[in-house]
Amino acid sequence: MTVSPDRKPVVVTDLDEAFAAVRRTGLRLTAARRLVLEALLAARTPISAEDIADGLGGRMTQSDIASVYRNLETLGELGLVRHFHAGHGPGRYVLEGFGDREYLACESCGLLESVEPAALETVRDAVRDLSGFEAGFSHFPIVGLCARCAQKRRG
């Protein structure tokens, strides 16, 4: 997904706001776009395009997965949807406003755990102090082992 680094997130809290935000851009609010927005709002947590297609319960055919991806990309370019990768799994998508958290991804079991952005401030500060680099975790979560998998590995 190509998203301008200076794009402004468009935070929405309900379907009416999401639909209005799409219309303000001059884009049509197609049936597929509506279904994708409805699925994202219902989830309120990061989900994959496949999860969206599966959750539509036959309202879109499996061959329409490409349509789900196209709509997610368009909604991302508009600033309505945040996209990131969690470990080795598929990309995950969340509506802006529900994605204003940072994520930790378990590379063993796939657990995706959200944390407040402030929880990673120490990490950001350490990276900046060490290299001058301003770290962000909006596209890639911190990958490691969840407490359960780490305990299993320790034995």
Per-range role (PLM):
Residues 34-39:
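Pre-recognition alpha-helix immediately N-terminal to the DNA-recognition helix
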Residues 13-26:
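Short, Lys/Arg-enriched N-terminal segment that forms or immediately precedes the first helix
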Residues 1-13:
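Short, intrinsically disordered or compositionally biased N-terminal tails of bacterial proteins
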Residues 51-57:
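A short acidic, leucine-rich amphipathic alpha-helix
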Residues 42-48:
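Short capping segments at the starts of secondary-structure elements
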